[in-house]
Curated annotation (Swiss-Prot):
One annotated GO molecular function: ATP binding
Location in the cell: Cytoplasm
EC number(s) given by UniProt: 6.3.1.2
Taxonomic lineage: Eukaryota, Viridiplantae, Streptophyta, Embryophyta, Tracheophyta
Organism of derivation: Vitis vinifera (Grape)
Transmembrane domains' residue ranges: none
Domain named GS beta-grasp: residues: 19-99
The protein's name: Glutamine synthetase cytosolic isozyme 1
PROSITE patterns reported in the protein's UniProt record: GLNA_1, GLNA_ATP, GS_BETA_GRASP, GS_CATALYTIC
Any one annotated GO CC term: cytoplasm
Subunit-structure text: Homooctamer.
Top-level class of the enzyme under EC nomenclature: ligase
Length: 356
């Protein structure tokens, strides 16, 4: 008698050329991901060869009921770690039937910024540190925490090991390998300062691909937590009090910064970011004011500070970069629930295109 798992793991390529394509898009909140699948006649490796598709935007908060169709434009293909074989995941962005990007489509504007010749010439690299919290499904309280109570104070949990310090490692490792399988440039994982909280890093990725890879890595993570019966939270401050929040520190460099004399270019870029601090904060995630308090390795939301090796700064420059006189910097302001299309393109726009 076949088990459910046997059928889920059926190898389609033994009997058919057909493939399953999972179309993924950002939903109406600008933070939720949605997806649905369709069958195609054979393997596809170029997003331009995938058909556009549509969905009911009135059910995702993205269109009115009387004109509910939203069109999906396939943009980036990844291998599907759940169905495996020649089956794929595809990150899409969203348009009206007339071809206008809908308000939650932040990819379209980001792609325009990244295709600007001045930006493209600088080959912007991004490394994004995505923090997240795993919650118990019934009570929405972090895993490993006593229900309605608290664990011991922070200290033992960051990069910690052991049944009394690390909870959810099976999810973390499953996600790590699934992202590598999918073709996402995931570069590492670690346990975070607050118990039940973890981080993974995506990058270095160039331009628009940083946003595509981060969104699909989030999709894969939420699918894995669904299987595990755990709730995934990107809330920037899931637990009030003396507990670290969750961010999405964004590491950034341009060709000029990576070349000799790059430290001077970095300092000019940071100066420009300081002049547009308010605009960046407004675009860096919902609820970030609960996280950026000046405590727990953050700078106060209303203050712009930068420093070498300073984790209480808005922008941190690494000692290696200072020593080499070239390299990258880290924008520590983005919240864990930020839209990577918005954050990556805005950093490029401010540091390369914007003239104060």
């Amino acid at each position: 008698m076949a088990l459910l798992s046997d059928l889920i793991n059926l190898n389609l390529s033994e009997t058919t050329e057909k493939v399953i394509v999972e179309y993924i898009w950002v939903g109406g909140s600008g933070m939720d991901l949605r997806s649905k699948a369709r069958t195609l006649s054979g393997p596809v490796s170029d997003p331009a060869k995938l058909p556009k598709w549509n969905y009911d935007g009135s059910s995702t908060g993205q269109a009115p009921g009387e004109d509910s169709e939203v069109i999906l434009y396939p943009q980036a293909i990844f291998k599907d770690p759940f169905r495996r074989g020649n089956n794929i995941l595809v990150m899409c962005d969203t348009y009206t039937p007339a071809g206008e990007p809908i308000p939650t489509n932040k990819r379209c504007n980001a792609a325009k910024i990244f295709s600007h010749p001045d930006v493209a010439a600088e080959v912007p690299w991004y490394g994004i540190e995505q923090e997240y919290t795993l919650l118990q499904k019934e009570v929405k309280w972090p895993i490993g925490w006593p229900v309605g109570g608290f664990p011991g104070p922070q200290g033992p949990y960051y990069c910690g090991i052991g049944a009394d310090k690390a909870w959810g490692r099976d999810i973390v490792d499953a996600h790590y390998k699934a992202c590598l399988y999918a073709g996402i440039n995931i570069s590492g994982i670690n346990g975070e300062v607050m118990p039940g909280q973890w981080e993974y890093q995506v990058g270095p990725s160039v331009g628009i691909s940083a946003g595509d890879e981060l969104w699909v890595s989030r999709y894969i993570l939420e699918r894995i937590t669904e299987i595990a019966g755990v709730v995934l939270s990107f809330d920037p401050k899931p637990i009030q009090g003396d507990w670290n929040g969750a961010g999405a520190h964004t590491n950034y460099s341009t060709k000029s910064m990576r070349n000799d004399g790059g430290f001077e270019v970095i300092k000019k870029a940071i100066e420009k970011l300081g002049l547009r601090h308010k605009e960046h904060i407004a675009a860096y995630g919902e609820g970030n004011e609960r996280r950026l308090t000046g405590r727990h390795e953050t700078a106060d939301i209303n203050t712009f500070l930068w420093g070498v090796a300073n984790r209480g700064a808005s922008i941190r420059v690494g000692r290696d970069t200072e020593k080499a006189g070239k390299g990258y910097f880290e924008d520590r302001r983005p919240a864990s629930n930020m839209d990577p299309y918005v954050v990556t393109s805005m950093i490029a726009e401010t540091t390369i295109l914007w003239k104060p």
